[in-house]
Amino acid sequence: ELEAWARTAGHGFLAFDYSGHGESDGAFEDGTISAWRADALAAIDAHTSGPVILVGSSMGGWMALLTALARPARVAGLVLIAPAPDFTEKLMWPEFSPDAQAEIMEKGFTLRPSDYDEPYPITRALIEDGRTWQILDAPIQIDVPVRILQGKEDADVPWRHAERLVDTITSSDLVFTLIKDGDHRLSRDQDIARLKATCADIAHAAKA
């Protein structure tokens, strides 16, 4: 639906799956934040030109932020849905029991239950690599328009995590929308309508 909106509004549109996700090659357990950041940069560098607005959900929100920091001349705006920057260290690692943490460090991985699919492996490489890309502990020097959509009933990314991001990004043109009955995916009809309206707003604000 977002692609249809973009085409109708006269905007280009590019979507992709990170390696080990969706239709892309690779295994999830081989993935790291460094690798997925490289995927995002490669997609933008190879398949787009001019100013771009990045739309990222959950981990994709972290990737959008890292991409904006790496390509400040290219990124004209950000739309972040339930953004999860630093999730490996600040959300995931503290939730693991001492036994699971030990298993990751000694065995190299542990299986994490999922509400959406089969349990999936969280690797030592993912955790340790994620520590090199933490961005919430200092001001995030992004000065383009930013829009954040966050569900208050999100069971995966606490809304306070998104609120912390609001306080960390330097942009003065930042709007944080907290959807009181919204979950993590924000995929209901009203959520999609809100997302499209938000994209239209930021396209105007960014003049992209």
Protein language model features and the residues they cover:
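Catalytic nucleophile-loop/oxyanion-hole region of alpha/beta-hydrolase
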Residues: 22-47
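Catalytic histidine neighborhood in serine/cysteine hydrolases
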Residues: 169-185
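Hydrolase active-site cap/lid region
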Residues: 74-122
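Acidic catalytic loop of the alpha/beta-hydrolase fold
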Residues: 153-157, 185
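Short alpha-helix in the alpha/beta-hydrolase fold that links the catalytic acid
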Residues: 144, 158-167
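Catalytic histidine-centered segment of alpha/beta-hydrolase-like enzymes
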Residues: 182-195
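Short beta-strand/loop motif that positions the catalytic acidic residue
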Residues: 142, 148-150, 154
